[in-house]
Amino acid sequence: MDELENALAIPREEVLLVSAKEGTGVPELLEAIVERIPPPKGDPDKPLRALVFDSHYDQYKGVVVYVRLDEGTLRDDDRIRLMQSGAEAELIELGVFRPALVPVPLLAAGEVGYVATGLKNVREAQVGDTITIATDPAAAPLSSRAAGGFI
């Protein structure tokens, strides 16, 4: 315990003893997460700005991008635009990680998920690009600092 306190500068009373393998301390850990970690910020009513933090190509869904929504809401029937590349796409699928990919009808500000775009070239969805709604675009793309240093 002294080593953790000294190496990480964490007060002894804030250290939680947890073993997922044995199931000890897990309820306390979950409660501490709720109490200590602030909820995501962002206005779900503003124009969509979602930061692309990873992407890959799927032979059935096209380019799949992993995103964190900074502002706005993304629905599974939206047409999106990647602000840097200018590429537009109708969504094939929208979802979250649980830990498998699970389709959902919408994502809102503060959430992390994936977007199957149907695009054929992964270069059209680069890490650091910003996704917005094609018919109601945001005024400016995100920067990594604006997104909490996410990339």
Question: Predicted segment positions?
Answer:
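Conserved catalytic-core segments of large NTP-driven translation/proteostasis enzymes
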Residues: 5-151
